[in-house]
Curated annotation (Swiss-Prot):
The keyword Cytoplasm applies. This is Heat stress transcription factor B-1. It is found in: Cytoplasm; Nucleus. Belongs to the HSF family. Class B subfamily. A motif (Nuclear localization signal) lies at residues 263-267. GO terms for cellular component: cytoplasm; nucleus. SMART domains: HSF. The gene is HSFB1. It comes from Oryza sativa subsp. japonica.
Length: 302
């Protein structure tokens, strides 16, 4: 495989003269130097290479990278350990859907900037597994799952709305209590008006009767029965009002219509007496006008 041969060639070059570079003093860390060498090697561009602008590098084939390149440079084949090391030195992932990492001091052709990259915190050493017959490729945790489809979200929202609708909210109970309180106030006002009406009725009756001899409780019970009776109660009230307007003669009610007719007849007779024609009776000579003493007739009587 071309990638494996290129990796072997890079390993031989490092064993010849580049292994101890950056090991002490103020030089860059060995991890940064080895990573830069892997990215700069053009023979392995199909596995790992620089980005478009040379300010980041991309691991195109993580499996081949962990199997062929990591054992040559870091003596292990754990890709997740390599990613953790990058995070320790301040590298960040640029694109979510691929393994592209960047750091402000990690640029193409500018190895002198590697000394400016510092380790953020010490990590506990992890025992790397040897890459013997089988290659152990451990990848970082997968990316977070995609959001659910709209149909699932809609169904879950409907379930929440149905569950919330099953339990009545506190606002509905409060409004119902307020409505009951208003109804109670209305009934209290109607009762007060009924009592005032009863008092006014008693005051009116006191003009014609001795109210002190009346049993007020019986009157109130009768008034309640009349109100409950509906139309029958209204008729009894009308009869009671008619009795107040009429006059009793020896215990018998004299209808007001009869009185009106009597008054009308009396007025008619008075008018007839004033407008009655004088009959002329001839009693010899000369003519003498003698008024007739016969009864006058009303214009409406036959």
């Amino acid at each position: 495989m071309a990638a494996a041969e290129a990796a072997a060639a890079v390993g031989k070059q490092q064993q010849k003269g580049g292994g101890g570079r950056g090991g002490g003093g103020g030089g860059p860390a060995p991890f940064l130097t080895k990573t830069n060498q892997m990215v700069e090697e053009s023979a392995t561009d199909e596995v790992i290479s620089w980005g478009k602008e040379g300010r980041s590098f991309v691991v195109w084939k993580p499996v081949e990278f962990a199997r062929d390149l990591l054992p040559l440079h870091f003596k292990h084949c754990n890709f997740s350990s390599f990613v953790r090391q990058l995070n320790t030195y301040g590298f960040r992932k640029v694109v979510p859907d691929r393994w592209e990492f960047a750091n402000g001091n990690f640029r193409r052709g500018e190895q002198g900037l590697l000394s400016g990259i510092r380790r953020r915190k010490a990590t506990t050493p992890q025992s790397s597994k040897s890459c013997g017959s089988g290659v152990n490729v451990a990848f970082p945790p997968p990316l977070p799952p995609l959001p659910p489809e709209p149909s699932a979200t809609t169904s879950s929202g409907n379930d929440r709305s149905s569950s919330s609708a099953s339990s009545p909210p506190r606002a509905d109970i409060t409004s119902e209590n307020e409505q009951l309180r208003k109804d109670n106030q209305t009934l209290t006002m109607e009762l007060a008006r009924a009592r005032r009406h009863c008092e006014e009725l008693l005051g009116f009756l006191s003009r014609f009767l001795d109210v002190r001899q009346l049993d007020l409780r019986l009157l109130m019970q009768e008034d309640m029965r009349a109100a409950a009776g509906g139309v029958g109660g209204e008729q009894r009230v009308q009869e009671h009002a008619r009795e107040e307007k009429c006059v009793k003669l020896f215990g018998v009610l004299l209808d007001d219509t009869h009185g009106a007719a009597t008054r009308k007849r009396a007025r008619c007779e008075e008018a007839a007496a004033s407008e009655r024609p004088i009959k002329m009776i001839r009693i010899g000579e000369p003519w003498v006008s003698v008024p007739s003493s016969g009864p006058a007739r009303c214009g409406g009587d036959n």
